[in-house]
Amino acid sequence: MQNRKTFSWVKEQMTRSIYVSIMIYVITRASISNAYPIFAQQVYENPREATGRIVCANCHLANKPVDIEVPQAVLPDTVFEAVVRIPYDMQLKQVLANGKKGALNVGAVIILPEGFELAPPDRISPEIKEKMGNLSFQFYRPNKRNILVIGPVPGQKYSEIVFPILSPDPATKKDVHFLKYPIYVGGNRGRGQIYPDGNKSNNTVYNATSAGIVSRIARKEKGGYEITIVDASEGRQVVDIIPPGPELLVSEGESIKLDQPLTSNPNVGGFGQGDTEIVLQDPLRVQGLLFFLASVILAQIFLVLKKKQFEKVQLYEMNF
């Protein structure tokens, strides 16, 4: 009887351990896959600083182009496409966190005017869904539904990202008006050079923290190097740690200066930002414009007919 109880207890503990392991794996995997948006969301309340700079540029130091395309004008309560293009050479390979080379990923943030937001799934047309692919967008904050983030996602498949946007209706949202509004966008390709805590990633150049002679270069077991620099003038030595990824530019016995690059810069990516404008158009204005154009066309037609009638009368009087 006691053996049976012991077996049941062991079985219960094993089941619980397996369940906990699975939960840890799922949580860890989710946090890694969503690393790009979470970095900005956890550190910055607003992704756009007062200077107009998007905060992603604090970690992605290289400047690269990005482009956004939206309609010139949209009607209220309408779904439209905001297309963000993040161009780069598809043949390039970036340094991964483990020091190996791999394909670049991309990410984007789009800052819409207040009232504009991600279109609900039931409002998105099949054509737009096909262009979107399997992308899953997030709100930057639960209370900032006009700021959307995406990434990291495979760059070879999603260098062009289609955001489905729903325009607001001033009839139901009193703080929205029929005006011209700015839209801001930021897009990166590849990993950053600095983490939000200020530490360097392995996707950047490493400089000497002291002047002197390189007395020893030791390769670490898991990759990377320990470079020992001896400063003869001060009689001290400094050890610079190089993570796996960057290639060494110095050798033992070499004399180096302070801040001299010890490695190459492996970064092949970068961040770019841009902006555009969109008009929330009043349907009554459109109807009024159409009515005006129609009246002008009718006036022209009547003028031509009147002129022809006058010419006929003149011709008749001359013949008479």
From Swiss-Prot:
InterPro entries hit by this protein: Cyt-f_TM, Cyt_f, Cyt_f_lg_dom, Cyt_f_lg_dom_sf, Rudment_hybrid_motif
Keywords: Chloroplast, Electron transport, Heme, Iron, Membrane, Metal-binding, Photosynthesis, Plastid, Signal, Thylakoid, Transmembrane, Transmembrane helix, Transport
Known cofactor(s): heme
PROSITE patterns named among the record's database cross-references: CYTF
GO molecular function: electron transfer activity; heme binding; iron ion binding
Membrane association type: Single-pass membrane protein
Subunit structure: The 4 large subunits of the cytochrome b6-f complex are cytochrome b6, subunit IV (17 kDa polypeptide, petD), cytochrome f and the Rieske protein, while the 4 small subunits are PetG, PetL, PetM and PetN. The complex functions as a dimer.
Family to which this protein belongs: Belongs to the cytochrome f family.
The protein's name in its UniProt record: Cytochrome f
